[in-house]
Amino acid sequence: MSPAPAGATALPGPLPGDVHDAVLALAAAASRADGATSLSEDAVLRLRAGDGAVQHLVRHEDGVLAGYAQLVPSGDGEGDGFEGELLVHPGHRRRGHGGALLAAVEERAGARPVRLWSHGDTPGASALAARAGWTRARELLRMERTSAGLSDLAVPDLAAGLAVRPFVPGADDAAWVALNAAAFATHPEQGRWTLDDLRARLAEPWFDPALLLLAEAPDGLAAFCWMKVEDGLGELYVLGVDPARSGAGLGRALLVRGLRAVAGRVDRVDLYVDGDNLRAVRLYAGLGFSRAATDVQYASGPR
């Protein structure tokens, strides 16, 4: 354990069990208060990772974890900057913890740019960012719909030569990663997935290969729709289409099949989509999804 600037404490990963649990408890409290999942899945998985590139910053008050920030290199180049997340326990807000963590993040980043997620678009996060000279760089929408009527969705036909089948762990891993990279070549997070990233998800208790649907052509995979079911909640986890087949309705055809696959197992289905991806937003709205919350990524100002 080493002291970090501005009164934060830096911890190497993987986090000790008690700190790991405290971060998850903090995130759960923030999620309840803000109406949004306050720590992304990637960030949660990094709590257990021993990757030296992950920086964990914590703030305590009266022996209780009051705030947490996570920082990782962005992109593939060492000089590209950093990205991460910052959250403060709702019972310890307006006491300087957010500002102290943000100052520690800036100190560790030096002159390199940083982007931090705030989940839920809260007034407190917006005010903190404004005081520090950070600006809104990206919005991620959470859209949702009830499960009512999912099983009644009309199933679109597939183009000739395409067939839908479930994912086969081990056999399909490499082909899936290649298609995912092509489908999300311009996406700042999803397109960087490696085999290790995929296999970390395949090892999660919620993973069900029957809910990872593949559209296969004679020359290889053409698209996929990955649904997640956990604790009665459904999620469109990832929907990807080979760019060469974009615009032909393949994404919608697979998504309808995915939604029908979780009908009867969930009360609600959520999904996340970039706010500026208007084409995808229209697709989801046409299938009954509506905007429920917004996550904001803030970019650091000049230092």
UniProtKB/Swiss-Prot annotation:
Pfam families noted in UniProt: Acetyltransf_1
This protein's record includes keyword Ribonucleoprotein: no
Binding residues annotated for acetyl-CoA 1, in chain numbering: L86, L87, V88
Catalytic activity: 1D-myo-inositol 2-(L-cysteinylamino)-2-deoxy-alpha-D-glucopyranoside + acetyl-CoA = mycothiol + CoA + H(+)
Gene3D superfamilies: 3.40.630.30
Xref: InterPro entries: Acyl_CoA_acyltransferase, Bact_Acetyltransf, GNAT_dom, Mycothiol_AcTrfase
GO biological process: mycothiol biosynthetic process
Group of enzyme by EC: transferase
One example GO MF annotation: mycothiol synthase activity
Domain of life from the UniProt record: Bacteria
The protein's Enzyme Commission number: 2.3.1.189
Residues at which acetyl-CoA 2 binds: 239-241, 246-252, 277-282
Start and end residues of each N-acetyltransferase domain: 10-156, 162-303
Keywords: Acyltransferase, Repeat, Transferase
Binding site for 1D-myo-inositol 2-(L-cysteinylamino)-2-deoxy-alpha-D-glucopyranoside: E41, E189, K228, E235, Y272
Job of this protein: Catalyzes the transfer of acetyl from acetyl-CoA to desacetylmycothiol (Cys-GlcN-Ins) to form mycothiol.
HAMAP family according to UniProt: MshD
Subunit record text: Monomer.
Name used for this protein in its record: Mycothiol acetyltransferase
Classification of source organism: Bacteria, Bacillati, Actinomycetota, Actinomycetes, Kineosporiales
